[in-house]
């Protein structure tokens, strides 16, 4: 499992460094802004992605948006959006997606770690 996760992480880093990543990230953020509903929102991105802050702030939304670098270790990329008024969050960070896929694999295979 660890080898698969390391390979997946390497593929994610490769994707982040590609020309397709910026478009993917902006579309995920736009989708998440809709999903969390109306209200003030904070968008957390990796410190490497903070260079996209101005583009993110231009995404059409009627709410107040704040963009911040996530302080999480291994955030990798992607975004986490929090509606600060409604306390609703959508997590499209690669860290979360990898964790979810690992859990799905462990559940479907019947393996247990510990």
What are the language-model segments listed below?
Residues 1-114:
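Elongated, mostly alpha-helical coiled-coil "stalk/stator" tethers of large membrane protein machines
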């Amino acid at each position: 499992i660890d080898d698969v996760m390391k390979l997946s992480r390497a593929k994610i880093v490769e994707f982040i460094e590609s020309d397709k990543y910026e478009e993917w990230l902006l579309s995920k953020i736009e989708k998440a802004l809709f999903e969390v509903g109306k209200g003030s929102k904070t968008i957390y991105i990796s410190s490497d992605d903070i260079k996209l802050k101005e583009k993110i702030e231009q995404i059409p939304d009627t709410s107040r948006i704040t963009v911040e670098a996530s302080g999480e270790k291994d955030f990798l990329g992607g975004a986490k959006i929090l509606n600060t008024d409604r306390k609703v969050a959508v997590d499209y960070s690669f860290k979360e997606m990898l964790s979810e896929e690992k859990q799905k694999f462990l559940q479907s295979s019947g393996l247990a770690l510990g």
